[in-house]
Amino acid sequence: MQLLKSPDESEVYQGQFGEFTITQSDRTGVLIYRAGLGVAALCFAIGATLVLQQSDNPIAIQAVTPVFACFWIALGVSLATIHIYMIALHRALQVFWAIGGAAALFVAVQSSEPLALAVYEHPATLWGIGFIFAALNGIYFKEAFCFNRLETKFLTPGVPLLILGHMFGFLSAENEQFLLAIWAALFIIFAVRKFFQPIPQDIGDKSVFEYLKHQ
C-alpha cells in the first residue's frame, strides 16, 4: 500500500487492485475501533483485579457483572468497526459476540449467584459465554497475523488455554489466576499500543475490500 498524494480531505493510495482513498470517515472508524478496545481492556482489567484481589468480597464480585457488560458492549463496538478482508470471518466474530452475550445474560438472569461466581462454579457456562472470548481472540489473531504484535502472539494461544483449562479442569486454580492476570496485563498493553499505530494500517488496502465485494 503506497501513498500517492494527499489532498485536503483524503489521502490517495495505490492498492493491490487500484487506487483508493482514505477519508476522515475511515479514520474516525479506526479511532472508534481503538477506543472500543481501550474500554474493553480497561473493563477486563478491572474485572480481573476484582476477581483476583477481592474474591472474598461479595460486593466486589457482584460488581464484576456490570463491568463485564461494559466490556461486552465495548468489544461489540470494536467488532463493528474493525477492518477484516474476509467478510465471512468478520460476520462470524460478530455472531460469536452476540451468542456469548445472550448466554451471559441468560446465566446472569437465571442464576442466584453473581455472574463471575456462576461461571467459576459452573464451567459448563463457558460453552455459551466462551463465544465472547472466541470473538475477542479473533481480534488478537488478526492483530498477530497482520501486525506481528508480540503481546497478541501470547494472547492468541493463552486465551483458549485458560478457557478450555477451566472448562475441562486441567488447570490448577493458581495457574488459572496466573493466566488471567497475564491476559489482563497483555490486553492493556495491546490496547495502549494500538493508539500509537499509524491509522492507515488499521484501514488496510481498500481496493482489496472492493475486489472481494464483487467476487
Language-model features and meaning:
Residues 1-72, 209-213:
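N-terminal topogenic module of multi-pass integral membrane proteins
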Residues 59-114:
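A glycine-rich, hydrophobic loop/mini-helix early in the fold
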Residues 200-215:
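Short, highly charged, low-complexity non-transmembrane loops/tails of multi-pass membrane proteins
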Residues 37-47, 51, 71-78, 101-105, ...:
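Helical transmembrane-bundle signal
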Residues 75-89, 136-146, 194-195:
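C-terminal ends of transmembrane helices
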Residues 101-160:
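Membrane-proximal helix-loop-helix units in multi-pass membrane proteins
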Residues 57-73, 116-130, 180:
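Structural signature of hydrophobic alpha-helical transmembrane segments
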Residues 171-183:
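Loop-to-transmembrane alpha-helix initiation sites
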